[in-house]
């Protein structure tokens, strides 16, 4: 999967696959920690539902110092990874990586795996959901429209300057281009926008705004 390759290309020693419906366990994370050659290991959960499992690995990893960064989305994880500096100490890296992550807003588009009610919003199985920084803000049937609305919701005028539309296995480059062009028109010429083939399952779009 492209996103796994990306994380490895920017310096990750081990990538544990996960997603909305298949979150890795503490054992999965612990095995990944022990598979790295480093004495100090940074764990980037990139999903709020994985943070607790990651934190449980801290006391179980013998001979390793484990630091769990509170990254809640894949774009936050990418920005944090790009700030890692091999010449800096662990504290400096942790501060720089978290500062980078906190500057990233994330819109995600997925579907409901079953009928449910989330934060008081009734959702039917198969319905499209737009998440803004992990919270459901939009539901409906039009994937591209929900992607656009969700990204606009997290865009900060006069602060945001880069929009990256990462499209998944069940979406096309043409769809991503259409979403990107609508966002570019809405957000203005000073914003740099691009599309990336993420190939990820479950999420039709993951949109990074920073």
Segments predicted by a language model, with ranges:
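N-terminal loops that bind phosphate or other acidic moieties
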Residues: 1-210
């Amino acid at each position: 999967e492209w996103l796994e390759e990306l994380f490895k290309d920017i310096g990750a020693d081990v990538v544990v696959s996960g997603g909305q419906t298949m979150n890795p366990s503490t054992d999965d994370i612990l095995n990944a920690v022990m598979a790295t050659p480093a004495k100090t290991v940074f764990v980037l959960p990139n999903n709020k539902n994985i943070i607790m499992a990651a934190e449980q690995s801290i006391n179980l990893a013998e001979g390793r110092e484990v630091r769990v960064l509170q990254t809640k989305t894949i774009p936050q994880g990418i920005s944090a990874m790009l700030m890692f500096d091999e010449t800096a100490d662990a504290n400096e890296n942790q501060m720089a990586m978290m500062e980078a992550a906190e500057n990233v807003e994330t819109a995600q588009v997925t579907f409901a795996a079953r009928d449910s009610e989330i934060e008081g919003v009734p959702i039917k199985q198969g319905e499209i959901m737009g998440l803004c920084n992990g919270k459901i803000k939009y539901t409906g049937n039009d994937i591209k429209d929900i992607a656009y609305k969700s990204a606009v919701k997290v865009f900060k005028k006069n602060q945001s300057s880069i929009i990256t539309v990462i499209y998944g296995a069940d979406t096309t480059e043409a769809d991503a281009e259409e979403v990107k062009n609508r966002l570019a028109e809405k957000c203005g010429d000073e914003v740099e926008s691009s599309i990336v083939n993420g190939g990820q399952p479950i999420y039709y779009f993951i949109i990074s705004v920073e």
